[in-house]
């Protein structure tokens, strides 16, 4: 049993595969357990997962060492690298603002070139991913999910990448009870901050179009569209912080007794 990281289950699975044991997917429910009851608890759980997976990537990298097949190496590495999405996601949410505020090019290209090359690639990759994932995952909800976590997992994952021995195991709170409906301002303040920045960029971009005769209108419009997309995602992420009152007296799990 691996004890060097805070995600001992994933690390133990990696070690078992290295020793020649096989993994199998069984398409039937064999166990049930409680999930986190609030967004704050869910984020704390994912912080531990993210830190632990990056620790494994540093301490017992699946791309190296003996015992794994190439598909296993790719599968484990993909699961670990996934949790490094925090910083790229934050950069994506801030990327259109330098041009809107300071006329600084993030993508040094004309509006026509962006329409000709960037947009087709984005559309193609989105459709391809959705086709591969079928109805099991949906691109837009995945973006919202990553946006919710990005602000909070960025620092822990970067620290684990630099110094994998830092960090401690924190037990995920489960079985708690929400006695009233409330909005978690503490968790949502990061999203609200990004909403304010993007909304300010939207207003200033429209102001530049209206007042600057030399403004590159098409590029400004592309960045405004980018900002509007960010606002849609951030608005949905903020809405998740609304915690509903629980009316059930105890958790219930569907089962079939034969």
Over which residues does each language-model region extend?
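Hydrophobic, membrane-facing alpha-helical anchors
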Residues: 62-72, 97-104, 175
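Short membrane-interface loop/juxtamembrane segments of multi-pass integral membrane proteins
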Residues: 170-183
């Amino acid at each position: 049993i691996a004890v060097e990281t805070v995600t001992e289950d994933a690390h133990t699975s990696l070690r078992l595969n290295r020793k020649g044991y096989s993994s199998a997917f069984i398409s039937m429910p064999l166990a049930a357990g409680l999930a986190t009851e609030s967004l704050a608890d869910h984020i704390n759980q994912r912080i531990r997962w993210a830190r632990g997976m990056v620790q494994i990537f540093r301490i017992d990298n699946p791309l190296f060492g003996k015992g794994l097949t190439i598909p296993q190496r790719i599968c484990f590495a993909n699961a670990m690298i996934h949790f490094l999405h925090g910083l790229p996601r934050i950069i994506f949410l801030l990327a259109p603002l330098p041009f809107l505020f300071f006329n600084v090019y993030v993508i040094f290209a004309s509006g026509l070139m962006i329409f000709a090359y960037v947009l087709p690639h984005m559309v193609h990759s989105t459709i391809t991913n959705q086709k591969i994932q079928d109805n099991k995952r949906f691109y837009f909800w995945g973006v919202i999910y990553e946006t919710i976590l990005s602000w909070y997992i960025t620092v822990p994952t970067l620290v684990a990448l630099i110094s994998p021995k830092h960090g401690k195991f924190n037990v995920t709170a489960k079985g708690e009870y929400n006695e009233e409906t409330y909005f978690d301002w503490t968790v949502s303040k990061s999203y609200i901050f990004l909403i304010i920045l993007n909304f300010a960029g939207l207003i200033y971009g429209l102001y530049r179009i209206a007042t600057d005769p030399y403004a590159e209108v098409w590029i400004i419009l592309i960045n405004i569209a980018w900002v509007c997309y960010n606002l849609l995602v951030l608005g949905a992420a903020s809405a998740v912080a609304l915690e509903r009152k629980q009316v059930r007296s105890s958790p219930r799990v569907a089962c079939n007794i034969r």
